[in-house]
Structure formats: structure tokens, C-alpha cells
């Protein structure tokens, strides 16, 4: 099986598409499907690209380590749609919510909650989806978002044993040699 502990993010970048195709070909109808909720927006284009790389890493981790078919529109849609254009951003959000409706689990990844993530968490709560959080730092905020939706936080769980999914993009996609492999 694929060894997730990669020596650098470039290798992961080169394998993520193949791994996702493998994932789609070999998963059965019984394989859980999850929507990866993580930040996309950033102050710079480089930051957006790092967040896109991070979500692809989260998807690979979910497949390899959790046995979950993970989906995330922000892994690829920014190549086609401009997040700074309100019309295109809304289209991307609508595509994401349509994908979310087809999943049974919401994986809340990273160590912060963005505006787009708040909408995804609200929608998952309204739909009764299982919500898994990987960073204790954002757990209370996720629970508050669920409660704002008029629901209890019973569907929200913390899974700290998979701490890789709590790492921010700048740790997963390091600009120097120290990165995610140092914490795995």
C-alpha cells in the first residue's frame, strides 16, 4: 500500500491525481464518502496555491489512512474559477455544496475556520452529516456554528489521533525542509 509519510510535498503533488483515480476505481458503494472542509482563501496567490496543495494532501490522507473517499472542489476549481470574482466564487460555493450533499461525512481540516468553511459546516449540520474535527483549536468554533444553525452539536466529534488533518498549509507545504513529515 501507499506509504503516506512522504519526504516532500512535491512527491505528494505528483501522486495525488493518480491516487484519487485509484480511489474512485477501487472504492465500493460501501466506502464512506467525505467532503473535505478546509481554507482556500489567502492574502496572496501563492497562499491560495498552498491551500489547494494542502487540501489535496488531506484528501490523500483520508483515503490512505482513513479508508474514506474524500472530495474537495477547492482542490481543482480555482484552476477554472476566480475566487476573487463574486460570481465565480458563488458558482464554486454552489458546486461545493452540491458535492457536500452527496457525502455522509464532513472532515474539518486545518487549524482555522474561513468564511466559506462556515457555510459548509452550517450546511452539513442542517443535512445531519457527521462532522469530524481534527484540531482542538477550532472545535469550539465548529460547535458554535452548528448551534447557530439551531442544532445540537451531537454530530461533531474530535479526532486528534489524525493530527495531520489539523496541520495548516504552511506546515504541510513547507517553504523550507522542515514540514509535515517531521510531525508524523
Positions of the model-derived regions?
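Conserved catalytic or regulatory cores that recognize and/or transform ribose-phosphate-containing ligands
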Residues: 1-184
Amino acid at each position: 500500500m501507499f506509504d503516506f509519510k512522504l519526504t516532500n510535498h512535491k512527491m505528494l503533488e505528483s501522486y495525488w491525481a493518480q491516487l484519487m483515480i485509484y480511489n474512485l476505481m477501487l472504492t465500493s458503494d460501501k466506502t464512506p464518502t467525505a467532503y473535505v472542509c478546509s481554507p482556500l482563501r489567502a492574502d496572496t496567490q501563492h497562499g491560495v496555491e498552498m491551500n489547494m496543495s494542502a487540501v489535496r494532501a488531506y484528501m490523500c490522507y483520508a483515503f490512505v489512512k482513513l479508508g474514506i473517499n474524500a472530495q474537495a472542489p477547492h482542490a481543482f476549481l480555482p484552476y477554472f474559477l476566480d475566487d476573487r470574482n463574486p460570481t465565480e466564487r458563488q458558482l464554486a460555493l454552489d458546486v461545493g455544496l452540491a458535492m457536500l450533499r452527496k457525502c455522509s461525512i464532513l472532515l474539518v481540516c486545518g487549524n482555522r475556520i474561513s468564511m466559506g468553511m462556515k457555510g459548509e459546516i452550517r450546511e452539513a449540520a442542517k443535512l445531519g452529516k457527521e462532522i469530524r474535527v481534527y484540531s482542538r483549536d477550532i472545535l469550539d468554533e465548529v460547535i458554535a456554528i452548528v448551534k447557530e444553525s439551531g442544532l445540537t452539536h451531537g454530530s461533531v466529534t474530535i479526532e486528534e489521533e489524525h493530527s495531520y488533518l489539523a496541520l495548516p498549509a504552511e506546515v504541510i507545504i513547507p517553504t523550507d525542509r522542515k514540514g509535515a513529515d517531521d510531525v508524523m
